[in-house]
């Protein structure tokens, strides 16, 4: 069946649902699911040693390609499996759980390489301006953060893939530790000389009874808000400037489960 016809039908349905207020692009999530080719080389009961050799193209499907399906993108699990086939990339409205756009590629195509094409194609008929884009760490690529911000004034909620980070020690993970060994609290941001700085304050500054463990002079200055203050410059890199430990990040990222639910329903349809 002609894929263009199916795509037009889906586009018409999305526009109708949007008009009815059922589909929205405020929170959109992208994920892919493997689609195995109908070939004996994908049979788990087959013990041929060369069935996943790149040059051993299945005769039953000359278009499929060799891909790798990881067990999870949520953790650092090493479990994965090879397969011959395709990938179905689906952009989902994470509020209604309904699909907005679909693209099928061969299995070797990396998820992140088609993300911007999918967003652009969606935006051409259903605007995604001011969206919050949710994806797993397979999409943790600097260009995606920048393009979502620049083209759509959007925001990315994507976990950090440490394999893409040259120096994890420079990341804004955790709060600075004061001289007393306590984790300091965030106390707002401000811009200064073209840079954004995060302010941190003493966690005991408002306490009336607690004493500073190291008896720091700043804690006994007689002021209402006492204790030490520190400032850290937030990186200009959008990817590294996200506080992934914040409630804001975690609550928004939890909406991405709608992508997994959709993929589960897709697989159950056969």
Language-model segment annotations:
Residues 1-153, 159-161:
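Polybasic low-complexity intrinsically disordered regions
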């Amino acid at each position: 069946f002609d894929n263009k016809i199916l795509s037009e039908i889906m586009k018409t349905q999305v526009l109708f649902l949007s008009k009815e207020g059922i589909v929205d692009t405020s929170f959109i999530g992208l994920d892919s699911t493997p689609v195995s080719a109908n070939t004996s080389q994908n049979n788990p009961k087959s013990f041929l040693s060369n069935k996943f050799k790149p040059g051993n193209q299945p005769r039953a499907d000359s278009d499929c390609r060799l891909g790798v399906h990881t067990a999870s993108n949520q953790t650092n699990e090493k479990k994965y499996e090879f397969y011959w086939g395709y990938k179905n990339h689906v952009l989902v409205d994470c509020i209604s759980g309904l699909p907005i756009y679909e693209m099928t590629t061969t299995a070797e195509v990396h998820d992140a390489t088609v993300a911007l094409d999918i967003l652009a194609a969606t935006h051409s008929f259903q605007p995604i301006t001011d969206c919050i884009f949710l994806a797993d760490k397979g999409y943790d690529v600097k260009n995606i953060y920048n393009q979502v911000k620049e083209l759509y004034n959007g925001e990315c909620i994507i976990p950090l893939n440490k394999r893409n980070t040259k120096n994890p020690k420079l990341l804004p993970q955790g709060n600075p530790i004061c001289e007393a060994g306590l984790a300091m609290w965030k106390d707002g941001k401000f811009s200064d000389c073209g840079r954004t700085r995060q302010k941190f304050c003493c966690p005991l500054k408002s306490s009336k009874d607690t004493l500073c463990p190291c008896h720091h002079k700043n804690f006994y200055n007689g002021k209402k808000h006492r204790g030490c203050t520190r400032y850290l410059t937030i990186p200009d890199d959008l990817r590294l400037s996200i506080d992934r430990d914040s409630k804001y990040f975690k609550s928004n990222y939890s909406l991405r489960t709608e992508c997994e639910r959709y993929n589960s329903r897709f697989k159950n349809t056969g």
